[in-house]
Amino acid sequence: MYENDNDLRSEKNLISYVSDCWNVASYKLPMSYKIDYVMYRDDSPVGFAEVKVRTHTFGTFPTYIISLAKVMEARRLARETNTKSILIVSWTDRTGYLDFFSHHQIRHGGRSDRNDWQDQEPMCHFDLKHFKGIGIR
């Protein structure tokens, strides 16, 4: 909803990099899916990915925070399709991913810089230790 052209370009560059590293084809999904991409290998779906590009270094914050609604949808897609659902994040100094089924804590919060009451909701806090590296980025 709030993505601009620069955000989408950065996201596309990241998913292209990851797709090359993992030898998968990734396709942008319609907004109705609530997850950014589906990934295929040899014409078979292997998983879904939410893609985020951050402007700070890994470890700036103690956890990675994402909406509970997003996590629930990612898990539902993985269960229904017998595939994986992952969160791919590029920080300024590294790129990593985590399985949406990783342990997390739930706290209320969210963004407060857009004056949108819908930005405050239950949020999942994933410990950074759950992230695995991708490539050498």
Predicted regions and their residues:
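A structural signal for short, well-ordered beta-strand segments and their strand-loop junctions
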Residues: 28, 48-50, 86-90
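Short acidic/glycine-enriched loop/turn segments that link adjacent beta-strands
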Residues: 31-35, 93-95
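Acidic-basic catalytic patches of nuclease active cores, encompassing PD-(D/E)XK
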Residues: 1-31
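Intrinsically disordered, low-complexity terminal regions enriched in charged/polar residues
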Residues: 96-137
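Conserved catalytic cores of phosphodiester-cleaving nucleases, focusing on short active-site segments
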Residues: 37-39, 43-57
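Nucleic-acid nuclease catalytic cores
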Residues: 75-104
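N-terminal targeting/trafficking signals and adjacent low-complexity tails
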Residues: 5, 61, 80, 86, ...
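Mg2+/Mn2+-dependent nuclease catalytic core
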Residues: 54-73, 77
